[in-house]
Amino acid sequence: MREIVLTQAGQCGNQIGAKFWEVISDEHAIDSAGTYHGDSRLQLERIDVYYNEACGGRYVPRAVLVDLEPGTLDSVRSGPFGQIFRPDSFIFGQCGAGNNWAKGHYTEGAELMESVMDVVRKEAESCDCLQGFQLTHSLGGGTGSGMGTLLLSKIREEYPDRIINTFSILPSPKVSDTVVEPYNATLSVHQLIENADETFCIDNEALYDICSRTLKLPTPTYGDLNHLVSATMSGVTTCLRFPGQLNADLRKLAVNMVPFPRLHFFMPGFAPLTSRGSQQYRALTVAELTQQMFDARNMMAACDPRHGRYLTAAAIFRGRMPMREVDEQMFNIQNKNSSYFADWLPHNVKTAVCDIPPRGLKMSATFIGNNTAIQELFKRVSEQFTAMFRRKAFLHWYTGEGMDEMEFTEAESNMNDLVSEYQQYQDATAEEEEFEEYAEEEEA
């Protein structure tokens, strides 16, 4: 049917990817060896979106796992679901990118690229009707950002008409693990603007906040953060994998969510937020789900949607629920908060409903917002970038790999343009044009 190939680049991308495969293998009742142990026809009906059926009825993920050092991939391989992947889906170098975007994009990463693309082609050829690619990576490191964006541009070259969406972990305002994060992130965003169709911006700080504030976890681990990300990733593709009353796929999402090609950076949210292993004591109502889903505290990007306006949004509900109630609640929220929605885009919220809830919940909702407040995220990175670039700090690491300073300047101005485009549409209203036309008529 409509297959998706998942590519994972770098340490962060592979850890999130591994968690994601655990989550959806559980949803489709597939054990760590790739054998099906379920009792529902629905679990197998569209399993081919993410899995290839191999001989002996084993299901193998359509995954490409890439890293420039063997460490992370070794731990994925020895992890709980390590045996489910095809051995030749693992492609790794030996020397690492050392948090250097240029190493990932131009030198070390470029050397591995041919063998990575071979695996991507092999996966794409085994598809019946390939819908698109998903990439999980972080923008702060070297491999996920540098090599991840190189992989994107290669895929875009070979498969120009397929949808590419990325789950990109952006540097956080307070939590930083690398000094050169602003450089790597800016150079990556520059690539994402041009080559991705949809980018889900997730950042660790927002995830930490959700874990400590909402889930009351005293010391959140990366495992907890990745659990949140994989819940969102699974929600975004639910409609492809399970039957529903209103379906959405990657392309429908893109068409409904992207009003202008450059503005494809979304903030995801998820409801209800529950910590790993905890059960919900009562089922939430559709109204509570909708409230929680639009709540600023549920956003997985560290920016406040109340500071901007929604150009578009999508809500994907899971579980048995009356359609009428869903429509009413979505209508209510737009009515009550109309100032937060762009009035020149009427009916700008897309809804999808899928009948199968995630494990352990009666119903859940995944939220995707294209909100102009996302500019806060890019502004923050841009300020840090400018502070360092003005002094040319750390630049020798990049120029030493053959990069030119011009590339930095271009990336910086492209990101600043993106910020001002978001600002322009945040200020736009439906009435402006009418006044202009009226004034022209008066003059005539």
Curated annotation (Swiss-Prot):
The keyword Iron does not apply. The modification Phosphoserine is found at S172. The modification 5-glutamyl polyglutamate is found at E436. It comes from Papio hamadryas (Hamadryas baboon). GTP binds at Q11, E69, S138, G142, T143, G144, N204, N226. A motif (MREI motif) lies at residues 1-4. This is Tubulin beta-8 chain. Gene3D superfamilies: Helix hairpin bin (1.10.287.600), Tubulin/FtsZ, C-terminal domain (3.30.1330.20), Tubulin/FtsZ, GTPase domain (3.40.50.1440).
